[in-house]
Structure formats: structure tokens, C-alpha cells
């Protein structure tokens, strides 16, 4: 099968969209499929992004920054995208978290008569609210409906996302979750030297991993930074870092980590907290659980499918999140081992090969649907 992936975000930007696309590329190549990636270039004034990734051609389009919409550059589609796709001759077009560039990819796919699978991964309407643009939420949903209703199939990563899409009259929605690297994220990566570096006096470590952007609501962890009986660690980087370093003056900020360093950071935490409620899936929750770390998250969005309350972690009411957080952390620190073992066990069947095989099944389904239409 020849698969063209139109990715709204890709390397050198590292986030949930990029990471899932990288996993899909790897699995497709390992299973004998051919792949083309269409993705944003770096903004003007920055070094150009790679045109080849692991042997796969990456066609780059110009990008622009839209600070009132997202902290990431957005790809601007060009008419020649049709020619790029025609030259590759794909069997299916995979739209990864489509927005501006994804819409261009969808238009090109429809023009060429190629079936498309749109992966809903970013809650743009929720993000708009986080950026102080509540009025834009309805417009964001109108755009999402306009785009996804034209795809042959929309894939949502969680029950909450499926319900949200259905409530906004988006058709042909199916479930496709995310895998986790259970050999990379492991409890045995716990590093006592790293823990002493973060917390020299041995206080329990509570951590967050993710992009430091308004929609993540990392500032809600201020109620923990004020405590003298634990150490807060923030892993990641982004536009809010300077502000958060002021709001969380006692926290350790590591910057962005990858690979073994990221695995060690997860496993070296005693409790993982994700404070934002606009996650369609929340991959960092799953990675923390694979690392044997109990999780606290809002009772909203993707974490509802991932966290089993009072077994693998705790889900807190969104409106009372900050009030309930200190007691929840204290409870999980006391019961860390029991919760951590259960958290690890809960993700062992969610490997990337299994999940990516499910994705190929969705590709085959839209190909079959198109064949039936033609007949």
C-alpha cells in the first residue's frame, strides 16, 4: 500500500502529533508499505527542516506562526500539493490532526479521487478557549465539521473525542487509540542519582511532562510548588516556560527530554500529574503508566479512557482540580507501589504494532468502501 501522510506537525517540532506520525511511519515501512510525508517547513529565518526522514521523503510546505491560534507553526497549503500527490500515486491519504495543511491535503485527495482518513487529535476549540478566545470556539467547531465531513473516515482517539465529534454532527467517526512503547518506558528506568539531583533531601517527586503552552494549564501545579514536603519537576519546553518559572519558583525545569533521558525522568517520578482538560488522548499519561507511575488527571477528555480511578490513578473534577490536587498527591505518594504496578499492567496490551495494525485496517476499510462505490 502507498500511504501519503499529511502531517499538521512534524519534526523538528516534537509533540503528540509528531510522535504518533513517527510511529506510523516506522510501522508502515516495517510491514512493507511505501510512505510519503507532507509537512510544514520551519518558519522563515530558521534553518530548513529535513527533507528525508529515515529513508522517507518529506515534502515541505511554507509555514507561518499564528500566535493567537497555536504556539506551533502551521503549514500553508500550496496548489502544487496536487502534483506532489499525483506523482506519488497514493492508495490512501492519512491526514494527521488536519487544520490548514490538512485541508489542503484533503482537497488534493478529493481532486485525485483518493480515499482519506482524518485523524482527530487536537482539540482546537478547547485550545481557543485556553488562549482567551472563547468566541472562536464555535468557529473552530464549524471548521472541524467542514473538514472532517469531507473525509472518508475520521478516527478519534478516545470515547470522549468520539462523543464530542458526534455532538457536533461529524459523520463516519471510528475509534483509533494510541500505542505506547512498553520496552522504552519501563519502571526499571528509575534513576536514584537523578532523583537525588532533583530532590537532594529525598522529598517525593511529582512531575509533569509536556509542551509548556497555555492549553496544558501547568500553572495549576502552583498549589504543589508551594509545598515543602515534595519536589515538583517540569519536563518540557514551550512558549510559557518563562512565565511558569515565575509561577512555579521551586520547581525543577529540565527542558525537553527524549529517548532514555525521558524514560528515566518518567520512571524517577513518584506521581505524574497532567492538569489540562483539553486532551483528546493524552499520550504522556500512558507513558507515565508504562513507567509504573500513578497518574492524576482531570476527569475529562482522553484520560477518562486511560486512568482507572482508585486503581491506576485518580481523576479530579475539572472545576475543583486545584483544590483536590494536594490531597490526591498525598494519597498516591502513600500508595505509590500498588498504583504503579496496576498502572504498568493496564497498558501492556497497548503496543504500537497492535495499534498501527488497527490503523492499516482503517485504511483498508476506506479503500474497500471506495471500491464498492465504484462498482
UniProtKB/Swiss-Prot annotation:
UniProt family annotation: Belongs to the glycosyltransferase group 1 family. Glycosyltransferase 4 subfamily.
GO cellular component, as recorded: membrane
GO molecular function (one): mannosyltransferase activity
Keywords, ordered alphabetically: Glycosyltransferase, Lipid biosynthesis, Lipid metabolism, Phospholipid biosynthesis, Phospholipid metabolism, Transferase, Virulence
EC number: 2.4.1.-
UniProt keyword Transmembrane helix present: no
Pathway entry: Phospholipid metabolism; phosphatidylinositol metabolism
Protein name: GDP-mannose-dependent alpha-mannosyltransferase
Xref: Pfam families: Glyco_transf_4 (PF13439), Glycos_transf_1 (PF00534)
GO biological process: glycolipid biosynthetic process; phosphatidylinositol metabolic process; phospholipid biosynthetic process
Paired cysteines (S-S): none
PANTHER family in UniProt: SULFOQUINOVOSYL TRANSFERASE SQD2 (PTHR45947:SF3)
Function as written in the Swiss-Prot or TrEMBL entry: Catalyzes the addition of a mannose residue from GDP-D-mannose to GlcAGroAc2 to generate 1,2-di-O-C16/C18:1-(alpha-D-mannopyranosyl)-(1-4)-(alpha-D-glucopyranosyluronic acid)-(1-3)-glycerol(ManGlcAGroAc2).
Domain of life: Bacteria
Amino acid at each position: 500500500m502507498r500511504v501519503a501522510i499529511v502531517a499538521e506537525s512534524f519534526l523538528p517540532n516534537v509533540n503528540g502529533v509528531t510522535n504518533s506520525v513517527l510511529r506510523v511511519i516506522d510501522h508502515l515501512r516495517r510491514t512493507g508499505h511505501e510512505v510519503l510525508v507532507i509537512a510544514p517547513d520551519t518558519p522563515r529565518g530558521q534553518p530548513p527542516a529535513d527533507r528525508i526522514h529515515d529513508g522517507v521523503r518529506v515534502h515541505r510546505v511554507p509555514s507561518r506562526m499564528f500566535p493567537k491560534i497555536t504556539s506551533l507553526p502551521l503549514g500553508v497549503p500550496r496548489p502544487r500539493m496536487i502534483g506532489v500527490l499525483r506523482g506519488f500515486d497514493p492508495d490512501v491519504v492519512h491526514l494527521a490532526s488536519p487544520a490548514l495543511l490538512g485541508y489542503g491535503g484533503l482537497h488534493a485527495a478529493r481532486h485525485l479521487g483518493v480515499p482519506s482518513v482524518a485523524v482527530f487529535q487536537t482539540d482546537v476549540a478547547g485550545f481557543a478557549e485556553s488562549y482567551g478566545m472563547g468566541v472562536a470556539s464555535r468557529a473552530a467547531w464549524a471548521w472541524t465539521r467542514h473538514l472532517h465531513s469531507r473525509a472518508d473516515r475520521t478516527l478519534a482517539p478516545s470515547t470522549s473525542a468520539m462523543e464530542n465529534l458526534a455532538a457536533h454532527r461529524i459523520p463516519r467517526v471510528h475509534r483509533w487509540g494510541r500505542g505506547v512503547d512498553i520496552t522504552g518506558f519501563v519502571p526499571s528506568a528509575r534513576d536514584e542519582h537523578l532523583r537525588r539531583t532533583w530532590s537532594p533531601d529525598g522529598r517525593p517527586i511529582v512531575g509533569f511532562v509536556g509542551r509548556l503552552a497555555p492549553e496544558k494549564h501547568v500553572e495549576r501545579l502552583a498549589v504543589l510548588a508551594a509545598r515543602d514536603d515534595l519536589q515538583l519537576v517540569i519536563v518540557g519546553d514551550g512558549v510559557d516556560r518563562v512565565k511558569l518559572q515565575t509561577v512555579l519558583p521551586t520547581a525543577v525545569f529540565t527542558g525537553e527530554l527524549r529517548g532514555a533521558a525521558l524514560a528515566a525522568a518518567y520512571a524517577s517520578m513518584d506521581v505524574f500529574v497532567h492538569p489540562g482538560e483539553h486532551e483528546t488522548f493524552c499520550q504522556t499519561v500512558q507513558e507515565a503508566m508504562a513507567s509504573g507511575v500513578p497518574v492524576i488527571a482531570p476527569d475529562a477528555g482522553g484520560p477518562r479512557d486511560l486512568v482507572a480511578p482508585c486503581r491506576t490513578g485518580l481523576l479530579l473534577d475539572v472545576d475543583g482540580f486545584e483544590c483536590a490536587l494536594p490531597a490526591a498527591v498525598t494519597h498516591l505518594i502513600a500508595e505509590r507501589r500498588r498504583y504503579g504496578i496496576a498502572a504498568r499492567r493496564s497498558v501492556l496490551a497497548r503496543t504500537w504494532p497492535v495499534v498501527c495494525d488497527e490503523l492499516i485496517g482503517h485504511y483498508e476499510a476506506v479503500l474497500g468502501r471506495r471500491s464498492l462505490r465504484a462498482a
